[in-house]
Amino acid sequence: MGTRSVALVLLAAVLLQALLPASAAEGLVRIALKKRPIDENSRVAARLSGEEGARRLGLRGANSLGGGGGEGDIVALKNYMNAQYFGEIGVGTPPQKFTVIFDTGSSNLWVPSAKCYFSIACFFHSRYKSGQSSTYQKNGKPAAIQYGTGSIAGFFSEDSVTVGDLVVKDQEFIEATKEPGLTFMVAKFDGILGLGFQEISVGDAVPVWYKMVEQGLVSEPVFSFWFNRHSDEGEGGEIVFGGMDPSHYKGNHTYVPVSQKGYWQFEMGDVLIGGKTTGFCASGCSAIADSGTSLLAGPTAIITEINEKIGATGVVSQECKTVVSQYGQQILDLLLAETQPSKICSQVGLCTFDGKHGVSAGIKSVVDDEAGESNGLQSGPMCNACEMAVVWMQNQLAQNKTQDLILNYINQLCDKLPSPMGESSVDCGSLASMPEISFTIGGKKFALKPEEYILKVGEGAAAQCISGFTAMDIPPPRGPLWILGDVFMGAYHTVFDYGKMRVGFAKSA
């Protein structure tokens, strides 16, 4: 080939590169996310669904969620009612369009089926018609997924799935033929595309993301989320497959290794309120980066302290007040005598074993006050309240507070326990006086400002403000656990590095 021919080939290559979309040239696949503001209808639906979820979980027992070591326990708690960010995919050939949540906290892809005849929810959403796809392959294996505020059931099928410019071939997914209840009927999305690990996939189905990597569709085994928190609605952000967009973040990412496959789970350090330690996670907690959870969920003991500092409404726990009035001084004396904190509640006779467990059952009893809820000290509300009091008192003693001040403060916290329905209101005019809440990840503090963790609903005189924090107690061995949902991921650009098994955070641009 002559010099002239080589030059022409090079020129053609340059021109072709210039004509390619920027994302293709970068080896990135971009999915635009739409943002929907939280409205009053969604809030009402969330509360109703939350009540149903609490009743269902109460029958199983709060402690059973983590005790069995099952990988699907967090999925069983998920609440999609206040989801705000959605993207579009196609299923079949030609592609049938569906709006989905890209959810790093679950691993299956499901969409409503045209064979869904008896669930009203299906008729409010797009439905997959296998007969209209030339690449459909029958599977038929039954499937069901139970979420915290809803469930779906159906069967597996296989077809091509279009994500942006990519076509994932032979993808196993669930055709949902049953979507009972309120949750998915009022949802603004059709289905869910899970981006978690295969370990938590129902039916052991290979997740869409795995297939992208296996079929060589992405340049790097990495995907990243950017949520546009500056937009009330419309352009909500972007998910990038194959890497990250430098215009979406500032500075460098702080990476932490995935500590347990299944979820994008990692180890997290102390949580600080206004720069002061809460003590609860000083020796370490686990956390999950979860794009399918709108709020930021954590242990009741810390959420209660946050509620108190931001002036959030709460519920009064008589069990908590009883512990303070009848056992508070004794607990303080044992802490001052350097008794091992995990043994204190059993020593005062409120727990039947040494070691922490979840407190969800206790908080539920505050509202429901159902007979029999507190039977058995091991999982009773008095034991739960005692364990929280020990954590709170430890933290106050570390700040050299007097015993009277400590007991008064703990009594105040008993009035600020989070609602079991997960929503706490705050005064919109008080944001300037609210503290920063910081999370220690990879040795670095990631702070959330009030305007980042308070969600505004409505406009003008009708506007209401709700806390972006909600209580969720996961006992050992899975917990204590934080779920860093969209409230956190909106402030921090998040990278999910499948190749190096790590999660990275940097300030969003």
Curated annotation (Swiss-Prot):
This is Aspartic proteinase oryzasin-1. One of its GO terms (biological process) is lipid metabolic process. Involved in the breakdown of propeptides of storage proteins in protein-storage vacuoles. Coiled coil: none annotated. It comes from the Eukaryota. Residues 315-420 form the Saposin B-type domain. InterPro entries: Aspartic_peptidase_A1, Aspartic_peptidase_AS, PEPTIDASE_A1, Peptidase_aspartic_dom_sf, Phytepsin, SapB_1, SapB_2, Saposin-like. It is found in: Vacuole. Gene3D superfamilies: Acid Proteases, Saposin-like. Residues 85-506 form the Peptidase A1 domain. Keywords: Aspartyl protease, Disulfide bond, Glycoprotein, Hydrolase, Protease, Signal, Vacuole, Zymogen. It is an enzyme of class 3 (hydrolase). It comes from Oryza sativa subsp. japonica (Rice). Its main location: other. Disulfide bonds join C116-C122, C281-C285, C320-C414, C345-C386, C351-C383, C428-C465. Its EC number is 3.4.23.-.
